Each structure stands twice: as structure tokens, then as C-alpha cells.
A protein has these predicted regions:
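Metallo-beta-lactamase
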Residues: 14-138, 173-242, 261-268, 319-344, ...
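Cap/insert and terminal regions of metallo-dependent hydrolase folds
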Residues: 18-44, 135, 144, 151, ...
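Active-site HxH/HxHxD metal-binding segment of metal-dependent hydrolases
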Residues: 115-122, 133-197, 208-209, 214
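Bacterial N-terminal signal peptides
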Residues: 6-15
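Acidic/histidine-rich helix-loop elements
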Residues: 112-131, 213-220, 271-280, 307
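Positively charged n-region of N-terminal signal peptides that target proteins for export
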Residues: 1-4
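Catalytic core of the metallo-beta-lactamase
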Residues: 98-102, 199-261, 277, 281-285
């Protein structure tokens, strides 16, 4: 126990006290900095290093001495229908921000995470509260993987190595992550800046802005870019927000790349606001993101899988439903899937 506490506190101390990046780079886009990247909207400043440190310390102690759990309904999904599907656009919620998206015969994974923990160590850190909704072995052939950022709940070493070894997909990542993947032996990678696009197997995938931050160690805070993604096929468009706070750029995304048939938007990890508001949306803000990007429907992600914040674990969809009713939106416009559930979109 002492070893576990010491290791985790050391990791979190490094993360909480991490240094930022340098000044703007002359002639470069506004989010580029010397040595890394920055948000262009300063309306949600990040908490101080000390505030972050004390929060994460409290989370570590709570996880050790008072771990929380929640049992959420799941759908048994053996993947057979997904492996046979070549025609219908579908989306399957594996858990957290991991989606299997099928569009025009192409299989896309977002932020794949199949590990028991979202952590740099196997014996501590946020543990998975519910099993992945689709077993890794049940996946159809994966053609494309998109990564939104380098945090442990979105970029998992074991999962991406396993995908590269068994499925050989094309990885599309924000700036700075290609080199990190190359160190793992993963080389079929293209890294993109905000608003860059690539055509893969007939789909157009665009890297879009997000309001967040990055870093896996003491030394690399904001050294790699963070983003969302859009996926456009012959007749359907999907928006994947990644991990983000609410800010005004979503309206521009909707104008430039929308409308979207489905918008996958995070609804969890929003309390306490002094820590979380700079990088995460509340359920209420998530619905505003859907409206801003001109989404026909919203799919709730980033909740019910890892215990990352202080809100009750089952609260995010409850708040989402109350806000949907307040806005007068039709129930079918807001999807809260069970782990493993597949829907056509």
C-alpha cells in the first residue's frame, strides 16, 4: 500500500506542477507556442499548479481509501453484426470516449481505451468501472484510428500497440503525437494541425480545434496538440469533440464543416468547476455544443467508465436529460447509449 501511494502521489505531483510552454511563434497559427501549444480562448484559465495538485491528491486518497463504483446497464455485443456490416452507418459505445464508427464500409475507432486503468502504472490510478462494451477480440477490421489528445484516458499504450499489431490501421493524430507513437514502433501515422484534413478510404477526416491541454509527465505539459475530429462520408457526417471545454469556436466548426448527423460530445468530469471548467463541458454545455455545430443528434461520451472527478458517477446523463427537457429538444435528438450498444445513425 505504501509503495502504491508513493508512486501515485509522485506521478500526480509531476503532473500538477508541470511547466507550460513558451511565447507565441511569430508567423505561426495563434495556438502554436515555442515548445508546444496553447488554447486561443483565454476565458477559461487553468487553475494554479497548487490547486491542481491538492485536487489530485484528494482524488488519489479517495480512490485508495473510499473507492466509488457504479453499475450501469450494458448490452451484450459479440460483434458479429458489426463484423458483417458493410452497408449501414453505425456507432457503438465501447466506453468513455471510445467509439466504433462504421461509415461507408470503413471502420473507425476514436480514442481507443481497453485497459483496466487510465494511468501510467498498472497498479494504481483511475480504474475502469465497467467492462468495455465490446471485447477487443470482437472488433471488426479497424481501418482508421483517431486520437484527440495524449491523456491516459484517451491515449492508452497497450491498446494502441495491440491495434497496430493486429489491425494495422492508419492513425490520425494531432501535432506532436506521431513521434510518441513512433517510439512504440507504430509508424502508419499522420499528424494534423487544426483544420487540416485527410482522405482515407473514401472518408474525409478533419482535425478540429478543442479547448483543453495535454501532457503525460512532468516534462511534456502542452507539448502535444489536442483536438476534435470530424468524419465525412458520401452522405453522412460525424462530429467527435474529443475532450474540451465549451467555447465559441464550435459555431465556426458547424459553419465550416456541418451540419452533422451525429455529434459525440463529452458530458462527464465537470466538478469541481475551478479545476474542470477549463478543459471539460458540463452536460448542459454539451447540448449547446451540439446546437453550435449544427448536430441533428448528440451522443453522450466521456462518462460512466473512469472515476475522474467529483460529480456522482451516474449524474451526467440525469443532468443532460433535465437540460434536454428545458430546451424542448425531442428525446431522439439526445442519445445516452449503454456500454456495448450499437445504433444506426
Amino acid at each position: 500500500m505504501t509503495r502504491t501511494i508513493g508512486a501515485v502521489l509522485g506521478v500526480l505531483l509531476l503532473a500538477g506542477c508541470a511547466a507550460g510552454v513558451g511565447e507565441p511563434k511569430p508567423g505561426a497559427p495563434a495556438h502554436h507556442r515555442r515548445g508546444g501549444f496553447a488554447n486561443v480562448d483565454a476565458s477559461h484559465p487553468h487553475a494554479s499548479g497548487w490547486t491542481r495538485w491538492t485536487f489530485f491528491l484528494s482524488r488519489v486518497l479517495a480512490a485508495i481509501f473510499a473507492p466509488r463504483s457504479v453499475t450501469l446497464p450494458a448490452v451484450e455485443n459479440d460483434g458479429a453484426a458489426l463484423r458483417a456490416n458493410r452497408e449501414f452507418p453505425t456507432v457503438t459505445w465501447v466506453g468513455h470516449s471510445t467509439l466504433l464508427v462504421q461509415l461507408d464500409g470503413v471502420n473507425v475507432l476514436t480514442d481507443p481505451q481497453w485497459s483496466p486503468r487510465a494511468s501510467p502504472v498498472s497498479f494504481a490510478g483511475p480504474r475502469r468501472l465497467n467492462e468495455p462494451g465490446l471485447a477487443f477480440e470482437a472488433l471488426p477490421p479497424i481501418h482508421v484510428v483517431v486520437i484527440s489528445q495524449d491523456h491516459y484516458d484517451h491515449l492508452d499504450v497497450d491498446t494502441v500497440k495491440r491495434l497496430a499489431a493486429t489491425h494495422h490501421p492508419r492513425f490520425l493524430v494531432p501535432l506532436g503525437i506521431k513521434e510518441w507513437l513512433a517510439a512504440l514502433g507504430i509508424t502508419d501515422v499522420e499528424e494534423l494541425d487544426w483544420w487540416d484534413a485527410r482522405d482515407v478510404r473514401g472518408l474525409t477526416l478533419t482535425c478540429v480545434p478543442a479547448q483543453h491541454f495535454s501532457g503525460r509527465t512532468f516534462w511534456d505539459r502542452n507539448r502535444r496538440l489536442w483536438s476534435g475530429w470530424t468524419v465525412a462520408g458520401r452522405t453522412k457526417r460525424l462530429f467527435f469533440a474529443g475532450d474540451t471545454a465549451y467555447y465559441g469556436a464550435f459555431r465556426e466548426m458547424g459553419q465550416r464543416l456541418g451540419p452533422f448527423d451525429l455529434a459525440a460530445i463529452p458530458i462527464g468530469a465537470y466538478l469541481p468547476p475551478e479545476i474542470m471548467k477549463a478543459g471539460h463541458t458540463t452536460p448542459e454545455e454539451a447540448l449547446q455544443v451540439m446546437l453550435d455545430v449544427r448536430g441533428a443528434r448528440m451522443l453522450a461520451i466521456h462518462w460512466g467508465t473512469f472515476d475522474l472527478a467529483e460529480e456522482p458517477l451516474a449524474e451526467p446523463p440525469e443532468r443532460l436529460e433535465r437540460e434536454r427537457q428545458r430546451l424542448g429538444l425531442e428525446p431522439d435528438r439526445v442519445w445516452v447509449l449503454k456500454h456495448g450498444e450499437t445504433r444506426q445513425w
